[in-house]
Swiss-Prot record:
Gene3D superfamilies, per database record: Phosphoglycerate kinase, N-terminal domain
Alphabetized Pfam families for the sequence: PGK
Residues the record lists as binding substrate: 21-23, 36, 59-62, 119, 159
GO terms for biological process, alphabetical: gluconeogenesis; glycolytic process
The protein's name: Phosphoglycerate kinase
Alphabetical list of CDD domains matching this protein: Phosphoglycerate_kinase
GO cellular component, one term: cytosol
Keywords: ATP-binding, Cytoplasm, Glycolysis, Kinase, Nucleotide-binding, Transferase
Enzyme Commission code(s) on record: 2.7.2.3
Origin species: Lactobacillus johnsonii (strain CNCM I-12250 / La1 / NCC 533)
HAMAP family in the cross-refs: Phosphoglyc_kinase
Reaction(s) the record says it catalyses: (2R)-3-phosphoglycerate + ATP = (2R)-3-phospho-glyceroyl phosphate + ADP
Compartment(s): Cytoplasm
Transferase keyword on record: yes
Length: 403
């Protein structure tokens, strides 16, 4: 079912509540990476260009104490947003109460207000985690501040919080619209097409430490993918399931039987490393060597080897749809980053394919290589994109009104 989007709404003179994802890294008041702020700009600009009053809500980090509040204020984000929009942005150091209501009452068409971190509602109250546990009264209060609601936070779409599901539910109950922003719409389009209607050959690339994080994705994508390429720590659980020696490599002993059943179910669709970069310890400075698919007892696999890279490249060169989630090795250490970087290069070389990257390390690799402009879509949601690839319904999308 197609969702209502921000451009379907009449925004002139309307108070537009927007749930954005401004959960950016901040240290000592300095923003380390403003990508998520930049990603929200198309929706914010559309609203203010069409005479709407943009009232922005976001969480930032996990708030467990008053000390966290000092570190996790959205004030630096509001200041950065003002620079990016090249216009004043009002920051309100509260997200409930008289100061909030007065700031909104004083807004003119085209103004932007940022309310304080929604997770400040997770402490110092009788309910408990009002935001994270979706206190309906909080959702109703926030909904009362606006005329329409736009959810543009894909990063929290797999969570049912007061600031997404709570507001949308209260809005719809009051006969007001709840729409998707441009970022949410883009995520639905790219991930939805990949999961539901991919152009073949469709190749899924999965990495990262744990099989347990990706079980649902593998099960959902086995029937849809032509190939599933597996690297990273999770590959060693699969190699162990095939009877290979994995030395001291990271693996999940309790998932070996499951890996066996996934291999049986997938037939030859699952492609595992045929060689590895192995070291005596988990350190960039440790002696390391290239070994086959059996790893010596005193070593651990920390990256895919050059033959595996070639094998993966050979499969990828014909792909028309590629979804990549998770690194091929211990990417944070230069000696074990090459497999991940080579996969990134292979994706960038594809000319007529839809390429989608999700997950922090895969995204970091794309940035390090400078290939982001050559990738069709880089997802802004880690857990949310995994849940989507599993075929799960995401509360933050389900709560948006259908067209």
């Amino acid at each position: 079912m197609a969702k209502l989007i921000v451009s379907d709404l009449d925004l002139k003179g309307k108070k537009v509540l927007v749930r954005v994802d401004f959960n950016v890294p901040i240290k000592n008041g300095v923003i380390g990476d403003d990508n998520r702020i930049v990603a929200a700009l198309p929706t914010i600009k559309y609203i203010i260009d069409h005479g709407g009053k943009a009232i922005l809500l976001s969480h930032l980090g996990r708030v467990k104490s008053d000390a966290d509040k000092k570190e996790l204020s959205l004030r630096p984000v509001a200041e950065r947003l003002s620079e990016l929009l090249e216009k004043p942005v009002t920051f309100v150091p509260e997200n409930e109460g008289k100061e909030v209501e007065e700031a909104i009452d004083n807004m003119k068409d085209g103004d932007v207000v940022v309310l304080e971190n929604t997770r400040f509602q997770d402490i110092d109250n009788d309910f408990g985690k009002r935001e994270s546990k979706n206190d309906p009264k909080l959702g109703e209060y926030w909904a009362s501040l606006g005329d329409v609601f736009v959810n543009d936070a894909f990063g929290t779409a797999h969570r049912s919080h007061a600031s997404n599901v709570g507001i949308a539910t209260a809005m719809k109950k009051a006969g007001k619209p709840a729409a998707a922003g441009y970022l949410l719409e883009k995520e639905i389009k790219f991930l939805g097409d990949a999961v539901e209607n991919p152009v073949h050959p469709f190749v899924t690339i999965l990495g990262g430490a744990k099989v347990s994080d990706k079980i649902g994705v593998i099960e959902n994508l086995i029937p849809k993918s032509d190939h599933i390429l597996i690297g990273g720590g999770m590959a060693y659980t699969f190699l162990a399931a095939q009877g290979h020696k994995i030395g001291k490599s990271l693996f999940e002993a309790d998932k070996v039987e499951l890996a066996k059943s996934l291999l049986e179910k997938a037939g030859d669709k699952i492609v595992l490393p045929v060689d590895n970069v192995a070291a005596t310890e988990f350190s960039n400075d440790a002696p390391h060597e290239i070994v086959g698919d059996d790893i010596p007892d005193n070593e651990m696999g920390l990256d895919i080897g050059p033959k595996t890279v070639e094998k993966f490249r050979d499969i990828l060169k014909d792909a028309k749809t590629v979804v990549w989630n998770g690194p091929m090795g211990a990417f944070e250490m230069p000696n074990y980053a090459e497999g991940t970087l080579e996969v990134g290069r292979a994706l960038a070389d594809l000319k007529d394919a839809v390429t989608i990257i999700g997950g922090g390390d895969s995204t970091a690799a794309a940035k390090q290589l400078g290939i982001a402009p050559k990738i069709s879509h880089i997802s802004t949601g880690g857990g949310a994109s995994l849940n989507y690839l599993e075929g799960k319904e995401l509360p933050g999308i389900a709560c948006v009104s259908d067209k």
